[in-house]
């Protein structure tokens, strides 16, 4: 049973019923997914920033944002408006073009990665056969922007931050890719929808986290490092590098870095839920629920209900990991740069390789349980 509705098909059919041609209806549909992607990512970031402030306040026994909107929910929006009206400063003797392009090179690939994130069977922008591979490829572009920003700023702290960002990304991209490859091996594909469908047959027992506990830990640690979250925020360590590659940035350029960091955090949490925790699938298979209720699986109201519940489940799982990442930031000390590189090259890389080989062996030995 499909746990979603075909939004594109229904939108085009609705426009055709109004007298528009199929080609024109399809043309009107094209900008909508990108607009939806921007809205979903931006709202997700606003919620993540608000959670960051409230959770950090709770950890430190403070109140946090309180007056701007109910429970301070509009505080991130106020911050964004404040940064819009700040002066855009260009440092002396800096490289104007690289300095301007740096934030865009960081943010654009992260937003584009949302096209592969599924919230339901048909609730995604593009069901690409190489979806997860596309995300890994796009995530490898962002460090180039950080290096550009650090180099172009004509500041030693910015340059050190950019170099650290490049070294950190290279160190953790490979373990991240190995963890994803192990999941793709079990799912017999790199598409995010295929990966979720493979986990939905038996409910919670089908989730990849039970068959890939080592891969899940490798992926989660590497994802935190890619997001530059504590304890892996070496590129912008305030106590060492002022603000790292962000030191000379102000106004909207600084806001783009800030936005990119939280968009990447929410994206990583969504992908953890998709790859290891069944994405939109429920702990109890929805087919079982439909049979217990005595309702036909093709019932349109049931399809809509399952679509809404699928989005809810995806967000609950994702924001649990956002909460975990925020909690780690305020409870774990920062590692040194040598410890960070040792963790990536001497621990996560060998563990990721062993996990991949172990997955291949188990797939051959137990093909039913491991997707043979």
UniProtKB/Swiss-Prot annotation:
It catalyses: a plastoquinone + NADH + (n+1) H(+)(in) = a plastoquinol + NAD(+) + n H(+)(out); a plastoquinone + NADPH + (n+1) H(+)(in) = a plastoquinol + NADP(+) + n H(+)(out). Keywords: Membrane, NAD, NADP, Plastoquinone, Quinone, Thylakoid, Translocase, Transmembrane, Transmembrane helix. The chain crosses the membrane at residues 27-47, 65-85, 97-117, 128-148, 176-196, 204-224, 254-274, 308-328, 347-367. The keyword Membrane applies. The keyword Thylakoid applies. It comes from the Bacteria. InterPro entries: NADH_UbQ_OxRdtase_su1/FPO (IPR001694), NADH_UbQ_OxRdtase_su1_CS (IPR018086). Pfam families: NADHdh. One of its GO terms (molecular function) is NADH dehydrogenase activity. Its EC number is 7.1.1.-. It is found in: Cellular thylakoid membrane. This is NAD(P)H-quinone oxidoreductase subunit 1. NDH-1 is composed of at least 11 different subunits. Its main location: membrane. It comes from Thermosynechococcus vestitus (strain NIES-2133 / IAM M-273 / BP-1). It is a multi-pass membrane protein. One of its GO terms (cellular component) is plasma membrane-derived thylakoid membrane. GO terms for biological process: aerobic respiration; photosynthesis, light reaction. Belongs to the complex I subunit 1 family. NDH-1 shuttles electrons from an unknown electron donor, via FMN and iron-sulfur (Fe-S) centers, to quinones in the respiratory and/or the photosynthetic chain. The immediate electron acceptor for the enzyme in this species is believed to be plastoquinone. Couples the redox reaction to proton translocation, and thus conserves the redox energy in a proton gradient. NCBIfam families: PRK06076.1-2, PRK06076.1-5.
């Amino acid at each position: 049973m499909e746990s979603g509705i075909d939004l594109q098909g229904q939108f085009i059919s609705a426009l055709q019923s109004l007298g528009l041609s199929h080609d024109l209806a399809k043309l009107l549909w094209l900008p909508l997914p990108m607009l939806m992607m921007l809205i979903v990512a931006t709202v997700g970031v606003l919620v993540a920033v608000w959670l960051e402030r409230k959770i950090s306040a709770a950890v430190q026994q403070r109140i946090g944002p309180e007056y701007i909107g109910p429970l301070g929910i509009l505080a991130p929006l106020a911050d964004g408006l404040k940064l819009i009206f700040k002066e855009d400063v260009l440092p002396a003797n800096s490289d104007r073009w690289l300095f301007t392009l740096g934030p865009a090179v960081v943010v654009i690939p992260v937003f584009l990665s949302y096209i592969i994130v599924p919230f339901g069977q048909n609730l995604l922008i593009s069901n690409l056969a190489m979806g997860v591979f596309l995300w890994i490829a796009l995530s490898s572009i962002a460090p180039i922007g950080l290096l550009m920003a650090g180099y172009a700023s004509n500041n030693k702290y910015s340059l050190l931050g950019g170099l650290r960002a490049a070294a950190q990304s290279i160190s953790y991209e490979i373990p991240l890719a190995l963890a994803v490859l192990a999941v793709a091996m079990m799912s017999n594909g790199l598409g995010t929808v295929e990966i979720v469908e493979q986990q939905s047959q038996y409910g919670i027992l089908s989730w990849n986290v039970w068959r890939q506990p080592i891969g899940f830990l490798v992926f989660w640690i590497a994802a935190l490092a890619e997001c530059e979250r504590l304890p892996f925020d070496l590129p912008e360590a305030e106590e060492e590098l002022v603000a790292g590659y962000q030191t000379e940035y102000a106004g909207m350029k600084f806001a783009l870095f800030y936005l990119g960091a939280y968009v990447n955090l929410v994206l990583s949490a969504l992908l953890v839920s998709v790859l290891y925790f069944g994405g939109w699938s429920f702990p109890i298979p929805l087919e079982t629920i439909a049979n217990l209720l005595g309702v036909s699986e093709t019932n349109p109201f049931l399809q809509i209900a399952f679509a809404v519940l699928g989005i809810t489940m995806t967000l609950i799982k994702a924001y649990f990991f956002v909460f975990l990442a925020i909690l780690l930031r305020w409870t774990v000390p920062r590692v040194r740069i040598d410890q960070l590189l040792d963790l990536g090259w001497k621990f996560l890389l060998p563990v990721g390789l062993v996990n991949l080989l172990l997955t291949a062996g188990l797939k051959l030995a137990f093909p039913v349980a491991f997707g043979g």
